[in-house]
Swiss-Prot record:
InterPro entries: Allantoicase, Allantoicase_dom, Galactose-bd-like_sf. GO terms for molecular function: allantoicase activity. HAMAP family: Allantoicase. One of its GO terms (biological process) is purine nucleobase metabolic process. It catalyses: allantoate + H2O = (S)-ureidoglycolate + urea. This is Probable allantoicase. Keywords: Hydrolase, Purine metabolism. The keyword Lipid metabolism does not apply. Its EC number is 3.5.3.4.
Length: 331
């Protein structure tokens, strides 16, 4: 099982470019485009690479400030949500990182922030070091749609990860509307898995199809009896009608078969839910998988009524690019 630097890293990265996160405005990104903050891949160093403005850096970098003030970037999150923690990553910024940074947030049902917007400080100014990750827990259950990332007074940051729980207004979903209850954009969250040696479990809930093997969940080769698995909390309770298991890009390393269990869980911690999952009812019996293919199951699904969590079992190991769990919302 992967070791996380902070417990909140298991939550969805609301500031992931793959979810649609982007810069709305920025005071200065002369040296490096601020939208690089949201790339899902770790920052890289390119030795000897320069562009018209100077050394190419994988992140956001502003000019050296020669007057009072500080730099800031206004960000629209790909999906609104409550924030559990952040990682301000200054990888490869050594003599050019900001000494400190802070984070503000707001929620707008539509439109973009303006001069009348009321911002809430979710992370007061914290000290930064060069070439380092800075993990900070945030306890705020309010949903936010936009962030204002402030760096004092200037400099460069490689990545900004904002981990939290996506928010969706489920009252707007029709009674007969079929939605992907496991999608990250709908609040689905990967809680735990047996192993994620080659790819994070949360990748399987991202929108679209995977761009490569690294954009999926892949386990190490199993050398002991048993099988690998991942547990997903659905964004909303629902009755499941269709399941899609996508092995795109996985050719010599896809699972032989898969099955899915489901349950309606009331309360409990992630670790307690992990233990309970052994005894959940069968939602989808074992199904043969093929390499590099989308597998759709409907008639094979058992009627369990409303469920809140599923457990995808893969036999014996391997990689899955995406998992879709479609059904009707239980109200």
């Amino acid at each position: 099982m992967k070791a996380y630097a902070a417990p909140f890293e298991k939550f969805v990265n609301l500031a992931d470019a793959r979810l649609g996160t982007k810069i709305i405005s920025v005071t200065d990104d002369w040296f490096a485009d601020a939208n690089r903050l949201f790339q899902p891949t770790p920052a890289v160093w390119k030795e000897g690479v320069f562009d018209d403005n100077g050394k190419w850096m994988d992140g956001w970098e502003s000019r050296r400030k020669r007057f009072e003030g500080y730099d800031s970037a206004v960000i629209r999150l790909g999906v609104p949500g409550s924030i559990k923690g952040v990682d301000i990553d200054t990888s490869f910024f050594t003599g050019n990182y900001p000494p400190s940074a802070s984070l503000e947030a707001c929620f707008l049902a539509s439109g973009e922030p303006d001069e009348t917007t009321q911002w809430v400080e979710v992370l007061s100014a914290v000290e930064l070091q060069g070439n380092s990750h800075h993990y900070h827990e945030i306890n705020n259950d309010q949903a936010f749609s936009h962030l204002r990332f402030n760096i004092y007074p200037d400099g460069g940051v490689a990545r900004l990860r904002v981990y939290g729980v996506p928010f969706r207004d489920w009252s707007s979903v029709g009674d007969n509307e079929q939605v992907d209850l496991a999608a990250a954009l709908n609040g689905g969250r990967a809680l735990a898995c047996s192993d994620e040696h080659f790819g994070r479990m949360s990748n399987i809930l991202n929108p679209g199809r995977g761009v490569n093997m690294g954009d999926g969940w892949e386990t190490a080769r199993r050398r002991t009896p048993g099988n690998d698995w991942v547990i997903v909390a659905l964004g909303h309770p629902g009755e499941i009608e269709k399941i899609i298991v996508d092995t795109l890009h996985f050719k010599g390393n896809y699972p032989d078969t898969c099955s899915i269990q489901g349950a309606f869980v009331k309360g409990g911690t992630d670790s307690q839910i992990e233990t309970q999952s052994l005894f959940w009812r069968e939602l989808l019996p074992a199904q043969k998988l093929e390499m590099h293919a989308e597998h759709t199951f409907a008639e094979q699904i058992k009627a369990l009524g409303p469920i809140t969590h599923i457990r995808l079992n893969v036999f014996p190991d391997g990689g899955v690019s995406r998992l879709r769990v479609l059904g009707k919302v239980s109200k």
